[in-house]
Every structure is written in structure tokens, then in C-alpha cells.
Design a protein with these regions (language model features):
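Bulky hydrophobic segments
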Residues: 1-188, 208-235
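Active-site scaffold segments
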Residues: 181-184, 196, 200
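Alpha-helical transmembrane segments of multi-pass membrane proteins
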Residues: 146, 150, 197-204
Length: 235
């Protein structure tokens, strides 16, 4: 039915509009949007992307549109991650600093914004929470680092067959996390912290193991790839 085609296209158009809004508020100094609202915008965009894929799948009788939708969601997630890690002013990021800082300032920044001692930052947070650090901010920081790379588990597992082997996924996610940590340091928008690498990687691993459970795996394939797997109590 043409109705499915029209609705599918409308969903994708709405996704495009919301993505443009997100990008505009991320790079413009005049258009400012709180980080939570940016998350909501891209979550809504992802929902429209999903249903766009479903309606186009019904119209064309081809599941490839669902995979396209998952790829679009992956791109939206990457945009959100880049915003938080490099561009997010609400998180103390100052990407423009790299263009105005002197060589001495840059050298000093590199010298003072890295930690290669495992659990040093985490221990510092826990020991000084409520004294030098707000407990709420400590929880947000630690929990945020644990959660923010979890979606990679889903996207890597279901978009790349190679990542269905745990050892391949582990190597990939470690490299990705290290890459983002280096980007923060090299753009002067954050620090390189081995504790962030530990938390980011741990979160992704835990979620990967969770979605690899037989019943959860079948459920996700039914939802996102429109498979018709039977799920029983033993799964």
C-alpha cells in the first residue's frame, strides 16, 4: 500500500529535521540546547527512524530497510557521543580552545590532563565524594562512563558479523574507547584517563553479554530485524 511508503518517507524526513536541529544546536553559539534535551531529540529521531524502516519494509516487502534504519540509529548515536565527548559545553568541553591556546598552554594541558594509573580517578572520587566532589556529580560521572558506550555492543554485534565473536568485540571496543579518549586529549576538550577506558569498556562488555543471552538475542532480532524467532522459558 502506498500509505506505508508515504508514512515511511515522512518518518525519515522527521528524522532528518531532528538531526539538523541537533547538529545546529551542537555547533552554534547562538542556538543552545541543554544536553538532556539533545538526548531526547535524538531518541525521538531514532524512534521515527525505526518506524520509517518498518513501514518501508511493509511496502517493499524487504527487510533491508530495517538494517538501513539500524545504521541510521548508529550514526545518530555516534553524533550524540561526539557531542558529549568533544563539543558538549555543559560537560565543560571547550573545543574552540585548541584554536586559541598557545604552544606552552597546549604543552601544559597535555602534561596535566592524563591518568595512566588504573582506578586512581575512581578512588579519588570515592574518597573525596561529599568533600571536594558533589556526590551526585560523582555518581553521574561514574555511571555515565559505565553507560555511554553500551550502545556499541548492540550496533557492533548486529551490524558486523565479525563482532559476534566476543574476542573480536572486546578488541574492537577497547580500540574505540582508546580512540575517543585520545580525541578528547588531542582536541583539548577533555583528559585521557585509563579509568574512563576501564568503565567504558566494562559497560559495553556487560551489555554485550546481556544481549547475547539466547532469549534476549532472539527478542532483539524480532524487534529490530523483524525475524520471527520463538522465545520460550528455557531461553
Amino acid at each position: 500500500m502506498k500509505k506505508n511508503l508515504i508514512i515511511g518517507i515522512i518518518c525519515y524526513v522527521i528524522t532528518g529535521v531532528l538531526t539538523i536541529l541537533f547538529l545546529a544546536t551542537s555547533v552554534s553559539v547562538k542556538l543552545i540546547m541543554p544536553e538532556l534535551e539533545k538526548v531526547i531529540v535524538l531518541c525521538v529521531a531514532s524512534i521515527f527512524t525505526y518506524f520509517g524502516g518498518r513501514f518501508l519494509t511493509k511496502y517493499h516487502n524487504s527487510k533491508k530497510y530495517m538494517k538501513i534504519s539500524i545504521w541510521v540509529m548508529f550514526i545518530l548515536y555516534l553524533l550524540l557521543l561526539i557531542n558529549f565527548i568533544v563539543l558538549g559545553n555543559n560537560f565543560g568541553r571547550n573545543f574552540e580552545f585548541i584554536f586559541t591556546a598557545s604552544k606552552d598552554t597546549i604543552k601544559s594541558y597535555f602534561d596535566n590532563n592524563y591518568n595512566i594509573i588504573p582506578f586512581n580517578t575512581i578512588k579519588n572520587y570515592l574518597d573525596n565524594s561529599g568533600i571536594y566532589f558533589d556526590i551526585k556529580l560523582v555518581c553521574i560521572n561514574l555511571l555515565g562512563n559505565l553507560l555511554c558506550f553500551m550502545p556499541f555492543a548492540f550496533f557492533l554485534k548486529y551490524l558486523f558479523k565479525r563482532e559476534n565473536k566476543f574476542i573480536n568485540f572486546l578488541l574492537t571496543i577497547v580500540l574505540i574507547v582508546i580512540f575517543f579518549e585520545l580525541i578528547q586529549l588531542l582536541t583539548l576538550s577533555g583528559s585521557f584517563d585509563v579509568d574512563d577506558i576501564i568503565l567504558n569498556t566494562l559497560g559495553a562488555i556487560l551489555f554485550y553479554l546481556f544481549i547475547s543471552l539466547k532469549g534476549i538475542d532472539k527478542l532483539l532480532k524480532n524487534i529490530f530485524f523483524l525475524e520471527k524467532n520463538k522465545i520460550n522459558g528455557k531461553d
